[in-house]
């Protein structure tokens, strides 16, 4: 046993135990194109085997942010990996790409195999939902950088799309209909404000139960995994129905919807056209946050906004319903230069 490294606070044996525990979770994410298993210096993927004509790779990386604090307080680590995958693959699918593979990075103060297995099991769950293979990762034990019960989680994904089917919003026109796909709740953005409003200002704890949240523990509601939209959106891409997609993450509607719009166009969003999960009202009241500012911070119940030609909206809604996805007509595209998003 490498005693000197152990004395420095790094457990080599615990690292071996983590690898042993996660192998079965990694195996269930296997998909066509995967060449190598975990354990090599890099993960191998055979793009040629998938039959693309003009493949364009789209990459994305993200983390979970301070939602990890809620996981720590609840001592619940089996879904936070889904959040990590979702934050990455939802960005990639917003440009029309099918996620192919994923890699994770975990940094911790002390290597706890039981906790890290829970984290990676969630990553694997997210990969299965997204159709992406978990082909590699890194677990870094960093005593002195993190407390023993702390860890950080980030991920990286690569997806692929035919060049002719890239979704970049360039064909969006005034009159296009905006369809919203519901979120599961807060997802993984805004948790610094969430914690300040709920725990500091309102004095709640993760174990507080509120009637407006069906008496569920607040921490349980906040840990609801970020929704993965890959399987809902891919049929729309295959039918060439989508002109643009906005992933509603940090910055809410105000920052994210304009990212898909050409210059000179804006989004007119009809408030009340979709249900807003009650957790947002709880946060707004607890933190005394201006109602309209909430739309500049959170997803407010919509994780994706999709631009569709008016004459193809019914077709898109039918495909979404067939995929088991509830969708709402939430607005339309207008000609406007100054304000890029109208919320009314």
Curated annotation (Swiss-Prot):
Record flagged with keyword Cytoplasm: yes
EC number: 6.3.3.1
Main location: cytoplasm
Enzyme class, spelled out: ligase
InterPro entries attached to this UniProt entry: PurM-like_C_dom, PurM-like_C_sf, PurM-like_N, PurM-like_N_sf, PurM_cligase
Pathway: Purine metabolism; IMP biosynthesis via de novo pathway; 5-amino-1-(5-phospho-D-ribosyl)imidazole from N(2)-formyl-N(1)-(5-phospho-D-ribosyl)glycinamide: step 2/2
Protein's GO biological process: 'de novo' IMP biosynthetic process; adenine biosynthetic process
GO annotations of cellular component type: cytosol
One family name in Pfam for this protein: AIRS
Gene Ontology MF terms in the entry: ATP binding; phosphoribosylamine-glycine ligase activity; phosphoribosylformylglycinamidine cyclo-ligase activity
Enzymatic reactions: 2-formamido-N(1)-(5-O-phospho-beta-D-ribosyl)acetamidine + ATP = 5-amino-1-(5-phospho-beta-D-ribosyl)imidazole + ADP + phosphate + H(+)
The family this protein is said to belong to: Belongs to the AIR synthase family.
HAMAP family on file: AIRS
Name used for this protein in its record: Phosphoribosylformylglycinamidine cyclo-ligase
């Amino acid at each position: 046993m490498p005693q000197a490294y152990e004395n420095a606070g790094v457990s080599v044996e615990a690292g071996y135990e983590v690898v042993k525990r996660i192998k079965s979770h990694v195996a269930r994410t296997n998909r066509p194109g995967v060449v190598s298993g975990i354990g090599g210096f890099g993960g191998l993927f055979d793009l040629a085997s998938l039959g693309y004509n003009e493949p364009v790779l789209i990459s994305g990386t993200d983390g979970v942010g301070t939602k990890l604090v809620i996981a720590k307080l609840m001592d619940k680590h089996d879904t936070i990996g889904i959040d990590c995958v979702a934050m990455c693959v939802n960005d990639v699918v917003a440009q029309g790409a099918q996620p192919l593979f994923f890699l994770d990075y975990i940094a911790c103060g002390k290597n706890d195999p039981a906790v890290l297995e829970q984290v990676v099991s969630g990553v694997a769950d997210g990969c299965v939902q997204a159709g992406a293979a978990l082909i590699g990762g890194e677990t870094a034990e960093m005593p002195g950088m993190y407390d023993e019960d702390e860890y950080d989680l980030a991920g990286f994904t690569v997806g692929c799309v035919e060049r002719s089917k890239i979704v970049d919003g360039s064909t969006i026109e005034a009159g296009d209909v905006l369809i919203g796909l519901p979120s599961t709740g807060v997802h993984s953005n805004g948790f610094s404000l969430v914690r300040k409003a709920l725990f500091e200002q309102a004095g709640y704890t993760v174990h507080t139960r509120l009637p407006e949240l069906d008496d569920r523990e607040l921490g349980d509601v906040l840990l609801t995994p970020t929704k993965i939209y890959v399987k809902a959106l891919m049929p729309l891409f295959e039918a060439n129905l989508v002109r643009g997609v906005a992933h509603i993450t940090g910055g809410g509607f105000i920052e994210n919807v304009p990212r898909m719009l050409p210059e000179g166009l804006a989004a007119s969003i009809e408030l009340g056209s979709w249900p807003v999960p009650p957790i947002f009202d709880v946060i707004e009241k607890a933190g005394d946050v201006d109602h309209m500012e909430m739309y500049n911070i959170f997803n407010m119940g919509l994780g994706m906004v999709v631009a569709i030609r008016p004459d193809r909206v019914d077709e898109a809604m039918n495909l979404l319903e067939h995929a088991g996805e509830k969708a709402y007509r939430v607005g339309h595209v207008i000609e406007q230069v100054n304000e890029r998003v109208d919320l009314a």
